Regions:
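Iron-sulfur cluster-binding cysteine motifs and their immediate structural context
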Residues: 1-2, 20-43, 53-71
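Small-residue-rich anion-binding loops in enzyme active sites
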Residues: 1-13, 110-115
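A short, structure-level motif marking secondary-structure boundaries and short turns
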Residues: 5-8, 40-41, 80-82
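N-terminal basic/disordered segments at the start of proteins
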Residues: 5-23, 95
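Sterically constrained small-residue positions within well-ordered secondary structures
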Residues: 6, 33-35, 152
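Conserved SAM-binding loop
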Residues: 17, 51, 160-161
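Short, charged amphipathic alpha-helical surface segments
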Residues: 47-48
Length: 178
């Protein structure tokens, strides 16, 4: 335990619920708890926390995001109208995911559970792709997806991750690629 407990946010509603702090904590001092509205926030166990600051370093909200200048911009849509109709992005995610899966990679994205919660899952078969298609207008649980992504990348697999900007930035920070 540390004399100075780490506080990630002054107001819990500043948190985007990406779970990066929980997944990076080597002491398992952080758990994500849900409020009455279903939003997830980190709770730090001061008995387990050693004050290393890993959670602060990986946080995409409490750190400045380096903005990059956009390069060339492309617009596209999937030619198959059935697939593009099931997608929110004109089918581009489906096209990219299909290619990654065909080449033996793994795809991560948000899917509804049987309880109609939304969580990030991984798929390895094209027939599972419809679960990831379409927008989900609620916060998704990341579970241990960042840990699995890191493991898959270390094993040399191609990984496609589809998420909202704060999740993508948190993943980059978690992987040390900011």
């Amino acid at each position: 335990m540390t004399d100075k407990a780490i506080q990630l946010f002054k107001n819990k509603y500043q948190c985007c619920g990406c779970n990066a702090c929980e997944m990076v904590c080597g002491k398992k001092a952080i758990t994500m708890i849900e409020d009455e509205y279903g939003f997830r926030f980190p709770q730090i166990d001061t008995e387990k926390c050693v004050g290393c600051g890993s959670c602060q370093k990986v946080c995409c909200i409490n750190n400045d995001v380096e903005l990059c200048k956009p390069g060339t911009v492309y617009a596209a849509s999937y030619k198959n109208k059935d697939i593009s109709a099931k997608s929110a992005s004109g089918g581009i995610f489906a096209a990219l995911a299909k290619q990654v899966l065909t080449e033996g990679g793994i795809v991560f994205g948000s899917a509804y559970t049987k309880q109609f919660d939304v969580e990030v899952i991984s798929i390895e078969k094209i027939e599972d792709l419809p679960r990831l298609q379409g927008s989900k207008y609620v916060q998704s649980s990341m579970n241990s997806s960042f840990l699995k992504i890191k493991s898959e990348l270390q094993a040399g697999r191609t990984v496609l991750f589809c998420g909202v900007p704060c999740q993508v930035e948190a993943l980059k920070r978690f992987l040390g690629r900011s």
